[in-house]
Amino acid sequence: MQYDVIIIGAGIVGLTLAIGLAKQSLKVVLVDAGKQPKQPKPIKGDKAPVFNARVSAISSASEALLKDLDVWDKIARMQPYTHMHVWDTDGFGEIAFDTHSVPTMGTPKLALGHIIENEVINAALFEQLTHYANADCYFNAKASDLHTNESGASLLIEPNKAEAFHASAKLLVGADGANSKVRSSFGFTHTFWDYDHHGIVANVSTQYAHGNTARQAFTPFGPLAFLPLSDPHQSSIVFSQQSNQAAKLMDLNDAEFEKALQVAINNHYGSVTLNTPRVDFPLRMRYANKWTCKHVAIIGDAAHTIHPLAGQGANLGISDVLTLLDIVAKHKDSLGEVGMLRKYERCRKAEAMKVIATMEGFKRLFDGEQAFKKLIRNVGLLGANKLPGVKAFFIAQAMG
């Protein structure tokens, strides 16, 4: 089967790219080993919704692209956050800002961003993609025998309970995550380091309403974020902790863990109750040294993974999509050729490295209990809250 573009990986980044390319009238096939996304079930009566623990903080730039692709209005539920509060639990530094702090060009900002479950975004994206007759999707499918020649890229697609077939295209895009098969198949080496931290995620109910506020507390062992969900008394938590401390937290029973959250967040929410099981995962940085070769490109987490400190992983991937869509639109006659792909690589590699360096600097500053580090970060937060230029930098990071 002949296509213009083959995409492996149907997460937020892969689905967004597929819609954008289909909108440009290109013939696209999307292949993923996972299940087909489904919209969440409607809430019946007064029953509180059950949220998935994996969420993204979607920036205004990402929102703009999703609106342009007619996806935004299909997202079943989301929570705008209008305030952000960051502080050091063991010091005096803090920074707080809201939509009124954001410089605008005449149009007031209604939100700093939106907290949305990843599976809800994926469901909306897939629903929109099904409107395009020039886009094929295969879920529960295996992709193998990836290779290129002078005319394009090809692979074997093995759908679940269907006959395998070969597909070829001028461009193959790997949107297949941190352990990318596309990246490894074409020998794209990557820089890697382990943060020696684990992220613990869960959804919680709280005694006090979140007030549309995202809060992040820097504890002695790592940051804790409470991200507001569309139920006023529910939040998604991300607790990034040194690996040994994370293991201790995972060993606590639910009541003990809930109390630990309440203390770590300075009792801003009153009592805290777990709604979902805790899930932990190692935090690692990856940065591909090469992103493209003739007829092949990688994108999103396949090209870069960053510390979740500022929740910018999804936005960084969507920015990759925006750049690639723009370059494809201008170079359809040379789709998949080295020149056009290098333009994408040069632009996005530089931006990704800048974000990685910024997040790494924050991570190192807020990790550890040395007296000098504590003084610098507390003075830094205090100064950021007082100085407009520095505060604007923090706001820009929060808004992606």
Regions found by a protein language model. Give the residues of each.
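Glycine-rich FAD pyrophosphate-binding loop
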Residues: 22-54
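N-terminal FAD cofactor-binding segment of flavoenzymes
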Residues: 48-89
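C-terminal helical "tail/cap" subdomain of flavin- and related membrane-associated enzymes
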Residues: 326-400
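Conserved Rossmann-like nucleotide-cofactor binding loop
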Residues: 13, 36, 179
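FAD/FMN-dependent oxidoreductases across multiple families
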Residues: 245-338
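Conserved N-terminal helical subregion
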Residues: 68, 77-185, 193-198
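N-terminal Rossmann-like FAD-binding beta1-loop-alpha1 element of flavoenzymes
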Residues: 3-30
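Conserved FAD-binding catalytic core of PHBH/FMO-like flavoproteins
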Residues: 66, 160-166, 171-278, 288
